[in-house]
Each structure stands twice: as structure tokens, then as C-alpha cells.
UniProtKB/Swiss-Prot annotation:
Superkingdom, natural source: Eukaryota
Gene3D superfamilies: DD-peptidase/beta-lactamase superfamily
Annotated InterPro entries: Bact_CellWall_Synth/Modif, Beta-lactam-related, Beta-lactam/transpept-like, PGH-like_rpt
Source organism per UniProt: Epicoccum sorghinum (Endophyte fungus)
GO cellular component: extracellular region
Main location: secreted
SUPFAM superfamilies the record matches: beta-lactamase/transpeptidase-like
Protein name: Polyglycine hydrolase
Regions that span the bilayer: none
GO molecular-function term, one example from the UniProt record: serine-type endopeptidase activity
Compartment annotation: Secreted
Record's function text: Serine-type endopeptidase that cleaves Gly-Gly bonds in the polyglycine linker of host plant class IV chitinases to disrupt their chitin-binding, and thereby plays a role in lowering the defense responses of the host to the fungus. Degrades Z.mays Endochitinase A (CHIA). Degrades Z.mays Endochitinase B (CHIB). Has no activity on Z.mays CHIA following CHIA cleavage by fungalysin.
Coiled-coil intervals: none
Amino acid sequence: MYTSRLLLSNLASCLSLATLVASFPANQQDLTFAKRNGTFEQSVFYGLTGPEVEAKLAKLKADGYRPTSLNIHGSTSDAKYAGIWTKQTGDDFETILGANKTVYDAWLDSHKAQGYVSTHVSATGGSSDALFAGVMEKVPSVANWIQVCGLDNPYAYANATIDEPMYIKGVSMYGAPNERQYCILGHENLVNYQQTVFYQTDYFKKDYAKLLQSETSKRHWRPVFIDLSEDLLPTPIFDDTSVGQWVARTDLSASELEAEIAAQKAKNLYAVHIAGAGSKGSKYAVLFAEHLSPLERKWTVTGEVTGFKTNDVVAKDMDAVMEEFMKKNSVRQAQVAASVNGTVVAERSYTWAESDRAVVKPTDKFGLGSVSKMFTYAATTNLLNEGLLNHTTRVYPFLGMNNPADNRSLDITVDHLLQHTAGYNRDIKPDIGFIFRNIALERNQTTPVSLRELIEYVYEQPLDFTPGTDSVYSNYGTMLLSYLIANITGESFNSYIHKNVLNGLDVELYPTSPELNANNPIVQETKYTFYPAQDPASTKQVSNANGGDGSIREEAIGAFGLRASASTISQFLANHAAYDIGPRQAYTYRDGTIVGSRAFAQSQDLIDWSLILNTREYESEQKWEQLVFGPISQWYKYALAE
């Protein structure tokens, strides 16, 4: 069914336009693409009037084409249409074109009652005379969806969802400047699908070029949707799904769009999204991709379980828990490993990812977050045992720093740093491990702040409480310890632990630079970006996993700057405490979190084990706790091999 604002008296003229539409090659391109498994056909149209697009879509539907993208733009008296239809099988769908809000809402409600789901929505005009175009499909996989039009503020959409997790399928901004309206469509987010949506408002307009740069600085991220307002403000949506090669173009005239479609066709890339603005001299935004739909994810397990009487049962149980968690939380990469007396008895690596991502191996290294602190505590243990330090050593005087802003700083001891009682409270002030860029800006410094400079900065600030009177978790404590260790030993902290702590285990610095991580098989997944701490003068944002969080991992190595495999962590626990100084301590654990990683290490009665993910952006902290303290941790259920 096609519903239109056109009167029935115009029906005959609409139907007679089929040949007229075909006579405007600049406004449509019917394309055939060669594929390894055959060919597919696609129709891209733009600049069509209501009668033209009605005739076009009726014929396309009759010929087996389905909607990939649909857009209405221009004035209400001269609305234009752009769209992409692809020849393929699929669920039943219905389309509406050029309807006012009353007609559109009635159509939407009627089809929703019949089990249809809104998949495309577009609007043009003002709040009182807006015209709408849309598609509804019978999509069994979408149980719940919410679409709200006529919003004055796009952020009010969250109120309509009543905290129900949604991923945004489409946005249409219409109306005049200072009188803007928004139509937003969301589908229920059942698998923690990650995306970023950048709404444009009159009080906060975002530069699309900068957004494109920053969002695509995250590995595998790309634009998946762009809306154009009549004054050419792009509203983009980005995500980390995979479609092979892709290209994004904006601000194209009709002739430039025609040339771009031809150029991308020559590269075997085809249009997957189109939006327009204006009735005359229209401008277009278009996205091209190698694959029409995102690649499906595949579940892969590598590694072995060798140290139990029922290895197959252990492997099956581990795999089931991890598969359920990773699929529900959209986690792509993970490892679990267990050791007894330093010998690995189980190591499993899990991948829930597209074919363009690496399959995780047991030897791959993940970021450890605060699990890195185990190595700082072990190094401190060495120096305590050798008499080079003691628990009561006053840290700042030992470093030759005797005139702090707060005299209480002189009383901070090694034990205070180990026990998180040194006087630093990250609930009162920002976490010191993540203020490298802030310090540089405060000092008008264009070079990255070193750990020594950070220590000097903190030394010049008042404490939050008297050392020893309270305990608040502190990244700065182990950062200061790592500096103290380097000062005492005369070598870098990294060098010292490799020579004196690791005993050949494969642990290394996790570099901050995105360039140094570009080919890392383990992707530090996050949707967040900001300006890089390692380049304070930069005006380009980067992934928070690459310094956008304000940290420099090279300088914070003693707190959260290392990476290793889960197997390595489980082996290290054979001789070292998980959370304290000294040798192995049963029934203790350490939990680490940093952008792009979540890690857990625990010593039980006989088993030492570790679990690591390549993201911390899962559904909730409760889900994480249910994972690490749930069945995956119940190693006592399985008898060890004799």
C-alpha cells in the first residue's frame, strides 16, 4: 500500500508519469552490481516529486525491490524525495509519502496494530505543516520500538522510552531555525548495541567534519546514518558494525551525486543511505558500502582445557557462560584462564565478532586496568624484602621533595600508598591518573605531561584528608610507587619488573598511541572520544582508549598501563598476592577497569584464574559481578587431574 497527500483526482496523472520518471537519468540510477555469489540490482533516486516517486516506488515494489533508504526534503509546496531501493527478498512492508502529521500518525498507529515496525521516517516543513514519509515492515526480531515526532528537544526522546534501552534507527530534523522539530525512531536494544548519535540544536551545533574525524578514530567505527536539515545541518549516527569498505559524502549537488554514485559503483561500493535538503539546488548526503547489510557475527572458541578429570565438561561449562554473556552484552573479545602452581590447566579465548576482526588466541594480550597494580605491589615487595624500602618510609622526603603545599604530604608513607590511605580522594577531586591533559592546559604546556611533572603538580595541591585517617581507592598511589621504584633502582619501572618480577612472563606496556595499536588483534572497544592527553595542543579528538580519557599509560604504567593474557595473569598469581604485597594469598582478588578493557584476577584454594574483556561498556556493573562471581568462578566443582 502507498499512501500519499495527493488527491485521487491526480491518480491518473501520477500513473502516467512512469515514462517521465525514466526520462530523468540525473535523478535516478538503476544499477547492477557484480557479486562473488551472483548479482544484485539497486535503484537510487533523488530530486523526484510526489507523483514521480509514487510511480517509481509502485513499480519497484512490483519488481521485487525493497527500501534501503527513504528521505523527504524541501518545502511543503514542492517536496522532493530521495531514496535507495534494492532488489531482494524480505518481510512485508508498506510505505507512506507526503502525509501531514494527522494522516501519518493514523497510518502509523494502524500498521503498528497489525504488527508492523517503523523502519524509516523522514519529515520536512514546519511544525504546523510538516509532511512525512516513512516505511513500516513486519520485522519479527523487533518486539518493541518507539517513534516520537514533533519534539522541540531531541534529548526529550529519552523521556518517551521510560529508561527502556533503545538504539536509534533514524532522526529527522525539520522546521525553521529556532523553531526546530525532531522525529526520532528507536528500536529496543536487547544486545547492548553500541552507537553514538549527535543531535543538532540551535544552542549547540556540531561540526560534522570534526565528528567524522573523531568517531572514525575509533577502530571499526563508521557513519551509518546522516540526516540533513533544510539549512544543511547534518545529524549523524555512528556505530562499530562492519560493512567492508565504506565512503561518506556530504554537500553534494545532484550532478556531483550522480558522478559519485558512478565512481563508487566502479569500486563495487553501493549506496546504503541517502538524505537531501532543499527543493531547488538540492544538496545530498550519501553513504556507500561494500556490503548492503552489516556482517553477521560469528562465535569462535580457541584454547584448551587440560588439567581436570572432566576437561570436556569444564570447557563446555566455561564456553556456555561466556557465550551467553558476550552475546547479550555485545562483547567481541575475551579470555578466561586458570592455573595450578603456575601451570595453566585451562585457557579459552572467545570471539563474538565479524569476519574482519581477529579471532582471539590464548596468547593475545588485553589491557589489564588496575590488575596492573599486582606488578607494582610485587616490585614493592622485592624492595621491602631487600631493605631498600620499609613500610614507614616517607615518600616525598625520600624523593627530595620537602616543601609541599600541604605539610601533611610529608607524612605519606609507603604503607599509605599500598593501603590507599595517603590522603587523595577521587570523589572530591578528579582521579589523578586521568588529569594529564588538564595539567598541561593549566600550565599552557604543549608537550605531554610526564609522571614527574604530574607528581610535582599533585605535590603543590592540598590533601583531601590526613594520611592514615581514611581509605579511598587511588590510582595515584601506585603511580607514585612506580616512580619511587624507578628512583631507587636507577632504571625504568618497566625495565625493573621485567628483570626482577615477571620471571619470563609475557607482560608489556599497553601504549597510548592509536598508531601503535592500529594492528593490535585485540581492539580496545569504546564509544567515547575526547582530546588526547599525549598531545595537549591537538584539536582532534581520539578514542578514550588512546588518551582521550586524560591518561597517558606510559606514565601510569604502575597503576593501569600494562597488558597481558589471562593465562599469564593466572600464572603470576601462583607466587604473588592478588591485592596485597607478599606471596600468594588464597581467596583474594583484584578487579581492573579502564576504557577498552575489564579484567579480573583471583586466587582460590588451589586454582588461580583470570577473566579479561576488551571493553567495559557492557550492560551494567551488576552483569559484570554476576559473571565473575557466578558459575565461571566455581572451579571447586571440578576435580583436578591427578
